[in-house]
Amino acid sequence: MNFDYIGQALGYHGQPLQKIWDDERGVDDLRLMGLTQVNYGVYQERQKYFTFQERAKRLKMHQFLARKATDLYDRTLVANVMEDSLLAQGNTYMTQMAPFEFFLNVKDKRKGWAHRLSALKQGDIIYTQVTRLASGNRLIVKPLCTAEPKHAYLADIPIKAVILQDFWGPLPLDKQGNPRSFVQNDILRCEINNISADTERLSLNMIGMFNKVPDLKFGLCDFKELPKYYSKIHNLDHPSASHYEDELNKALEFENPNYDLLFQMNGLQPNENLSLMSYLRAGFPEEENAAELRQKQASQWAFRSVADGIEHFKNGQQVEAFQCLNKALNIDPRNVEALVARGALYANRGSFLKGLQDFEKALHLNKYHVNARKYMGETLVALGRSYEEENRIAEAVKAYSDCLNLLPLHEEARQSLDALHRSGDGKRRISTEPSNMTGGQSSDESSSSSASDSECEDSAGKPKSNISQPFYAQHKLKQSGDEKLAVIDAHKANEFRLDDDETVSSVRKLLREASKHKKAKKKGKKKKDKKERRRSRTKSETEDPIELLKKIDFQEALRQDNKLMNSTRSDEERKAKIKSYLKEGGKESPPPPPPMKKTAVSSRKSSFDNVGPSTSRHAASVVGFGGAQPPPAPKFLGQKKHPEPAPKLSFQIKKRPLQMDKLGMLRLAAPAEPLKGGRSSSSRSRSRSRSRSRSRSRNRRLGRSTRSSLRSRRSGSRSRSISRSRSRRRRTYSRSRSPSPRSYGNRFVIGRYRNRRTRRSRSFHRRRSPSPILKRRSPSPFVPRRTPSPASRYRRSRSRSRSRSRSRSPRRFQSRYMPRDRGSVNRSRYSWHNPHKRSVSRTVEPNGKDERAATPPKKGVADDRSGREERA
């Protein structure tokens, strides 16, 4: 085992490791190694930051080090350290980066300077620059940087560094060999005597007090002797505008994946099996190693450079493209895509022979590569043309023949070869070989190494558009007698562009996971979208209007037009009918609306429809009238003038429903007397009050306008009262009952007449005598006892205001004994109460005066009123 490494481990882990070592390996093991006196200074510094929670982890780690000491500290692991000469040579392969503080911008600069100066120690070698010669033969210098291997940038720190004359050493010599004194801007190699980080002072010497190395020379030195990292940044501003990572990625050494040298510099062999388990160090047989994995890794590294080279090639940056492609081939010499791209680059620059060499290598590795065959054929044609211009007909014929051997259907090569055959000069020089002239068979003796031509027929069948007129065309024109055409420049004729088909697609497929070219793809996609939008706009703008007219279906348009005209005519006829009807008899009552679809409100049956046939006259009248509202009292039928009967339309005639009489026979219901349409314009007093209707069946479903019209038209309850208010602003609540079909439907429900009193008017009233018109009926076996007669059921009450208030009845279920004064509000269990909305009963007298005017109240009425107020 390596005793030095064990001593360093003991000094780092301290006495706990020593105790465990003695327990595991014996007490005399360390004594035999000569490790009786170990320096535990490092452990004592680390001990300050230990925590109790990590005590178990430290114990396990110490046990592992003691048990596996033979594997961890084996001497054979570091026995193959390279020689110093090889190490010195390997230093040039490493990236020389500027110190990290050069890129760092610290807010507290003083604190940063003190931290960097604290890293310097006595005896370190630094490079300085002379600023001036002070009195007393003191040399004032400015520190620049430290010598390798320590990298520290000191040029931005305002340090006062002094070199006394006693520590100058020998003076430098001039060109004649005479000693001279130090001058400004001289670069000196010095050694640190004393350092004070707080005061930022340095004391230097040039005699080597601490470093007794004969090869190291102090004193005057040249700028070339400065470290490489400083020579790169001495002209740059501090802090640097670029980032540390960007500079690292730019370095050529950083992109070199060859790690074998790094292994050797550290004494490790790359082909050895390095393991802490001894039985795994024997290794595996060489034939079991997967060379394909290593090749795949190298090709992935190379494809990055290939992609960059292709991008430079397309942008016209040929120098950068060559650098990237050469770098890719250095990493992976068998990279076919790099060979094809570099061959195309050579051919585009006019170096046809070099390009053909790269194409042949690519086809040797992959003889079915489409781009390699295609580009090689184009290069051979361009080479043949250049030979024709130089009047080297034999070489031109051979180039065209090689192209036809590679691509038998190449049209330009065949035409050029035929033209050379027809020329007299070419017939004497061309060697006759039928296999080469026909081009139907492939020759292995040609310059190309391909044997398959099935995959390039489509690409070779179409000639390039940028290829100029060949040599045979000029000869042909001479024989026909036409004008002679000038020969186009050879460079322009031989140029061809690199197609973006398999090469770029394969490169991008392999680099898709690395996502290096995603931005370029997005930009290209945006450009394509813009072009498509522009094309669509231009198409829409330049589209012929005649074509648009051809696309129109005129029959469908006429059909739609006829529909619209018919609908407008029917609307006009309907409007004309309504106007004529209004002129004839519509002043008294507006025409009824046309039949509409049944809504949920109209289609819903009332509660008394589910019970059975009714024997009362009022129920018959309601059924005959359609169930909307009962007829008015007979007393008021004669007070209004009957309007002239308007001609009824077919949809206005209502059919009378069937009704079951007392004997159980079905008969037509008796027709109800029609309602008086419109409002009478008599001088009677009209109520302006808004009586709150609590009807559960209709008023909640109707709107405000419909509700108000129903209150004024269809109310079957009319109460007349004379209001005698003490104040002009006194408002009375007119709460009169209204016939609700719901309250008469369930005849046989227990407790139906429990709240009979609540259906009467809340106002203080006197009972009327039975109506002489509606006679009281005789008892019937089909009607339960104590059923109210129609006369008493729809009896009106006299209120004390001469207002005709039309309102629906309140809800059926109310409390039995409610306060009966005019200020009481119906707050039953099923009613909705709004305390902010109160119905105001305001009556207009026939003479035009307000009901609120002070009138002398009757005596009886006044007494009754005072009595009610006392009870309230």
UniProtKB/Swiss-Prot annotation:
Key words of the record: Phosphoprotein, Repeat, TPR repeat
InterPro entries cross-referenced by the UniProt entry: TPR-like_helical_dom_sf, TPR_rpt, TTC14
Protein name, as recorded: Tetratricopeptide repeat protein 14 homolog
Biased composition (Polar residues): 432-441, 600-618
Modified residues (Phosphoserine): 536, 540, 606-607, 769, 771, 778, 780
Superkingdom, natural source: Eukaryota
Biased amino acid composition, Basic residues: 515-537, 685-734, 753-778, 793-814
Biased composition (Low complexity): 442-453, 735-747
